[in-house]
C-alpha cells in the first residue's frame, strides 16, 4: 500500500501491534487507513500538505487488533513520521529522535517507551541506527542493501527516488528480482535481476 505521486510525495506504512486507531472528533470526517494513503497521494504535493490533510480527518484502522504508522517524504527533502497513540495523531520530524537527519522506522512505536508490546522491530531499528550514524547521503542501491539487512517477514521493500519519481520494489524477501516503476510511465514495469 506504499506509494508515490507525480509531485514527488511518498508515503509508506508499517504495521504495529495492538492499539487500533478509531478517532471520534465530531468536527472531522472519517477516513480509513487504506483510503487515507491514496487520498494523501491524490491531494497532497508535499509533507506539510499531507500533515494538514491528515489533521482534518478521524482515522480508523482497517486491520483488526493492530495499528499502523507512516513515513511521509517529499522531493524537497522533507520527511515526517505519523503515529497515532491514544487516538491522537503525533508527528516526528528529523532530529527529534536520535538527533539524526534520517527518519527510519520499523514495527514499534517511536513515541512510546520500549517494553512489553512495543519491542517488535527494535533489533532492526538498532541496525538502521548503527548503519546510518555517519549521516551521509545514500545511493539508491545502498538503500536497498540496508532494507535487505533489516528484512524480517517483509512483504515488500521499496526504495524511492522522489526527484526522478521512481520506485524499485522487491517482493516477499526475493531480492533476486527487482521491479522498477516510473510515475511518468504508469503502464510500464522494468523487471531486473540486479538493482540497476
Stretch-by-stretch model annotation:
Residues 44, 58-61:
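Sec/Tat-exported extracytoplasmic proteins
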Residues 2-43, 48, 53, 65-68, ...:
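C-terminal, well-structured catalytic/ligand-binding subdomain of enzymes
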